[in-house]
Amino acid sequence: MAKESMKAREIKRAKLVAKYAEKRAALKQIVRTGDPAEAFEAAQKLQELPKNSNPIRMHNRCKLTGRPKGYIRQFGVSRIQFREMASNGLIPGVKKASW
């Protein structure tokens, strides 16, 4: 399992991304379409935003264990937890393949 501090860090990043999403999108739009002077100012303001408010810095982690690798997006858990939950019948509609 991942350390609690790593899980907390990811939660904090998610909150920052949500908080600054609109502001970041507006500034990026100005950088793309504005005249050079406005674009430069918008780029400066983008750099002043917190680093962790950038969605690129987020990493998918298992909701149960915090494991960063082997993440299954559709279910939000790692492959290990997915297999365990599917075997126990905790995920509706999932069963072992047979052909």
UniProtKB/Swiss-Prot annotation:
GO terms for cellular component: cytoplasm; small ribosomal subunit. PROSITE patterns: RIBOSOMAL_S14. GO terms for molecular function: rRNA binding; structural constituent of ribosome. The keyword Ribosomal protein applies. It comes from the Bacteria. Keywords: Ribonucleoprotein, Ribosomal protein, RNA-binding, rRNA-binding. GO terms for biological process: translation. PANTHER family: 30S RIBOSOMAL PROTEIN S14, SMALL RIBOSOMAL SUBUNIT PROTEIN US14M. Part of the 30S ribosomal subunit. Contacts proteins S3 and S10. Binds 16S rRNA, required for the assembly of 30S particles and may also be responsible for determining the conformation of the 16S rRNA at the A site. NCBIfam families: PRK08881.1. Belongs to the universal ribosomal protein uS14 family. This is Small ribosomal subunit protein uS14. It comes from Bacteroides fragilis (strain ATCC 25285 / DSM 2151 / CCUG 4856 / JCM 11019 / LMG 10263 / NCTC 9343 / Onslow / VPI 2553 / EN-2). The gene is rpsN.
